[in-house]
Every structure is written in C-alpha cells, then in structure tokens.
Amino acid sequence: MSARLPVLSPPRWPRLLLLSLLLLGAVPGPRRSGGFYLPGLAPVNFCDEEKKSDECKAEIELFVNRLDSVESVLPYEYTAFDFCQASEGKRPSENLGQVLFGERIEPSPYKFTFNKEETCKLVCTKTYHTEKAEDKQKLEFLKKSMLLNYQHHWIVDNMPVTWCYDVEDGQRFCNPGFPIGCYITDKGHAKDACVINSEFHERDTFYIFNHVDIKIYYHVVETGSMGARLVAAKLEPKSFKHTHIDKPDCSGPPMDISNKASGEIKIAYTYSVSFEEDKKIRWASRWDYILESMPHTHIQWFSIMNSLVIVLFLSGMVAMIMLRTLHKDIARYNQMDSTEDAQEEFGWKLVHGDIFRPPRKGMLLSVFLGSGTQILIMTFVTLFFACLGFLSPANRGALMTCAVVLWVLLGTPAGYVAARFYKSFGGEKWKTNVLLTSFLCPGIVFADFFIMNLILWGEGSSAAIPFGTLVAILALWFCISVPLTFIGAYFGFKKNAIEHPVRTNQIPRQIPEQSFYTKPLPGIIMGGILPFGCIFIQLFFILNSIWSHQMYYMFGFLFLVFIILVITCSEATILLCYFHLCAEDYHWQWRSFLTSGFTAVYFLIYAVHYFFSKLQITGTASTILYFGYTMIMVLIFFLFTGTIGFFACFWFVTKIYSVVKVD
C-alpha cells in the first residue's frame, strides 16, 4: 500500500465548499486559519463508555452522504447501492440549501464507541447469484459505478472522513472521500485507485474496497469540561477476499469481480477502528489539514495578487483619464458659453437634447434592471455575511439557503427599480412591467432548472429535487417574492419620474456615420474583456469546486474580486460610453447594459473551454446537465454585470450633463 498515487480528483461534494470556505479566515492571508470557534456550532465532547453522561457522549455515529463521480454529473444516494444498510437511525433533517445541492445524508451501519478499538469487524455480507436477474442488475450497477470512479462520502462529528495518500509531487493529499473500487482494463491498465496495490493485476476485473481501516484522532479538552473532542477521522480503503465469511481475518488476496464471473459471488464488508490522541490539532482548526493538503487548490497567491494589481492599475488609469478629460471638456464648454463661438458646440455636448431619449424596448430593459438589482444586492449581502463568518461552514447548506432567502426577500427593490426606470422611459403598461419583473427572468431560470431536474429524475439520481421541495420553491416565489415585487413596483410607479438635468428635443438628432471602433458591436465585445480579466482566475477555482469536486475556501479573495469586478464593469462601461457620446451617438442605455453584460459571454466561452480541456465528464445526460446549469449561471451573471454597467453609465451621464451650461 506504499505506492504513490497520481492525483485523484476529489469527489464531487459542492456542500464541502460551504463547510470549508471560512476556515482560513475572512480575508486573504496565510493558509493556516489560526483556529476559531465557528458561529452556530458547539463542539461535542466524547468520553469512555463508563464515563458517558448528558454532556459527554460515548457513541460515535458515522453518517453517509450521496456518492458521486468526477466522470458523471449524476450522484446517487447511498441506499441506491447494494451496500450494508443501517437497521435503525434517524435521517438528519436537511435545510433548503442542502436539498438544492442534492445532499442526502443518512445513518450508516458503522457504529463506534469512543476509545474502543475493533479489528476486522464484520458489518454484513452480500451474496449475488449471476443467474438471477435482480442480483445481476445490482452487480452491474456496482461495476458501472466502479468504472466511473464513484466515491463514498462519510461523515463523523460533522466533518468528512478523509483518505490521505502521497501524490506525485511528494506531498500528502487528503481526499474527503474514497472510491467504491477500481477497474483493471482488458489491456491490463490500472484505472484510478487500482494503482495502490500491485495485487490488482487481473485483466478485465473489478476490485471492490470492502474493508476500511479507520483512525479517529481526538484532542483532550484542557478546560474544566470533561472528555475529548474529535479533530480528524482518516481511513484507508482495502480489498480482501475473506476465506471465512462468517469469521473474516482481513488478510489474503483482494476481492476481485471479473467481468466473466459466473455462479455465486460473496462480498463481506468489514472495518477496523482505532483511536489516537493528537495534542497539536485544536477542534477549532481541525479542517486545516484537509485544506492545506489539497494539491489542486493550492492557490498561487502571487498570481492572484498580480492580477488584482493589474486590474487596479488599469482601473486607476481609466479613472484618471476620465477625470482629466472630462474636467477639461467641462471647463472648455463653460468658457465657450461666454464667447462669440458659443454656438459652435462639438463632442458630447451636441447630443444633450437626445441623451435622455427613451430607449427602444424600454420595457425589457427595465425588467432586466429590476432582476439585476435583485441579484446584485443578494450577491453582495451573501458574500459579506460569509466573510464575516455569520454563515457557519459547519451548517451544511447555509450559504445556499441564505442566497435563496435573500433573493425571495429582495423582490421589493427589483419591482421598485423596474418601475422607476420604466416610468422614466415613458412607459404606461405598469401591469405588464410588474408581471414581467416577477416572472420573466425567474421563470427562465426555473424552466431550465426544471428540465435539468426531469433529466435527473429520469436517471434516478439523488440530485433530483423532490416534488415537495419544488412546491416549496414555487410557494416562496409566488407567495412571497411576487407580492414583494408588486409592493416595490407600487412605490416605484407612485413616485414622480426621474428628473433629468436637460430637456429632450421633440425631433431626434441624426447620428453621424460611425467609425468601426464606435459602432455598437465592437464596443460591446471590447467592453467585457477587462471585467472578465479580473475574475477568470477565481472563476477557474469556482468551476473546480463545482465540477471537479475541489473545495473552495477563499471567500475573502472572492469578496475582493467581487468589489473589483463592480469597479471594473463601471469604469469600462463609462469609458466606452464617453467615446460613443463624443462620436455623437446618444443610444447609451442598451449599449451600457450590454457592454458590461458581455462579460457573461466570455464566461460562457470559458465554461465551454473548461468542459473540453479540464473535465472528464462522459455521457449525454451529464453533458446536457453541465451546459444546462452553465446557462443558468450565465444568465444570472449577464443580469448582474449588465445592471452594474447601466447604473454606472446612468450616473455618469446624469453627472456630466448637470454640470455644463446648456441654452
């Protein structure tokens, strides 16, 4: 078992993202978290069986989560496999975020007693008769899962049981999961975890990990309270073809299942457990050893800081150019008003009579602005709370639950913003406006989500959202979000239309012939480059956490990148808006929204590149699911960035035309 493993992709466990984000602190810094007690989570004390009490437990429960694979987007519940099942035990209640993430935590048949070591204990035995259709189906499902490298996820004391091994660069990697088994191809090639044992050599054969050696580390409480706290749980998967099924000794050749096997196949599942005191690891920093060991998530701090510095430098340049140029323009225009050449206006001042002319499709633009405002505020508040530590990473699903609840409650600003701008655009169909704000963008997302859910239902995946949860989501949408949107729209329409600093002429001004660079499409395409440049590094790690099963724990950096993205979208849009106004093109409303919103197109292109260059996903259903969920993210990002660009340009245009003298 000493052979070094190549880096195996950690299991798909997006929820672990929520459990690990904050443990390195709220802001960028050294990788070690320094240790602190998590909000909303009290440590559990354990002690020997004879000393147990209400304040000190002796029994250690092991829970199992869904199984998933790096080669498939389809996770399955533990009970979908023919493993040993718990005879009793209550399934932990799940919050909305956990259900949406597809988390399925269940009790397991593995029960331990603190400080009581056990060796080669039999859990259960599974017997398969290959001539029976039902047994053959179960066995084939098990084989397919091993072929796709499906992985277990076990939980002890609300933290993952990890499998730690050496990787190619000589470092130690701790995987928050372990595979069901592995496969030797008909050409003798060892896939995935089959490289750990030289005895795995039979061609066209599966080897199932039917035994685990578990070691639980604890830290004795130094304060007045009694007992110890668990700080780590590690395991090593093994395979044994037990000679005596009823009295296994955990020795001998590995448990092989040939593709050509026939007759009766018996698999005995066993485990050994031991305990060890660790005086170095504290309960509050017990996640450090997992986060610090992950080879794929070692962040190149210099690379990220370099990108941030470049973006800040470019943003500073844009700001300086805008301030200096505008200052000179405004001074020149105001001086000209007192001279004989006052009538010879030029540049952006020429279009003052058309700058606030209502845009085409003002209804749709106002609806997008309302939904974008909802997403913008939701993102800011969620990231801010996460950085402060209010969303406990040990409270599984807390981040997703917070985001959904915020989105539902932020229907009021969405309706208000949509109504205010629609009224300022001269719109009168207020009922249509509020209905579209309530249902258009959320409806598109829900329709996409529902189609993806139908595919998951058809595949029998545990990620399929239960019907009751879908009803609950619809209830939140229709019974809370929609009424709040109507309330916001009521106040938005009740207020007077936004007052502009200059009057709009009755006859539209003719726009002169534009150069290539000032035409709409080139400007929109160029406008998204700079914002995308400031997020693509973080985007890589976020996509890794979602699709390549890696933990993402840099909320501090993510919040900084969020702020820089807002600044960059604003300044890039303002800069291009200024150039277009100087070219006497006053159609800035849609252009400003699409300029920064085009960042979402680069996001989509990057997601396609990521799929083909980084992922190992196979199968039509998994491919459809990947791009289906990607389109939801792209739409949300489009509304988010587009709204930032519009508001920045609206503020800019209002500001510059309010400080110049117009006859």
From Swiss-Prot:
GO biological process entries: ceramide metabolic process; glycosphingolipid biosynthetic process; protein localization to membrane; regulation of heparan sulfate proteoglycan biosynthetic process
Role according to the record: In the intracellular compartments, may function as a channel or small molecule transporter.
GO cellular component terms given for this protein: endosome membrane; Golgi apparatus; microtubule organizing center
Keyword field contains Signal: yes
Family statement: Belongs to the nonaspanin (TM9SF) (TC 9.A.2) family.
Membrane topology: Multi-pass membrane protein
Lumenal-side positions: 29-300, 396-398, 459-466, 544-554, 613-631
Topological domains annotated Cytoplasmic: 322-374, 420-437, 488-522, 576-591, 653-663
Keywords tagged on the record: Cytoplasm, Cytoskeleton, Endosome, Golgi apparatus, Membrane, Signal, Transmembrane, Transmembrane helix
Signal peptide start and end residues: 1-28
Transmembrane feature ranges: 301-321, 375-395, 399-419, 438-458, 467-487, 523-543, 555-575, 592-612, 632-652
Protein name: Transmembrane 9 superfamily member 2
Record keyword Ribonucleoprotein present: no
Localization annotation: Endosome membrane; Golgi outpost; Cytoplasm, Cytoskeleton, Microtubule organizing center
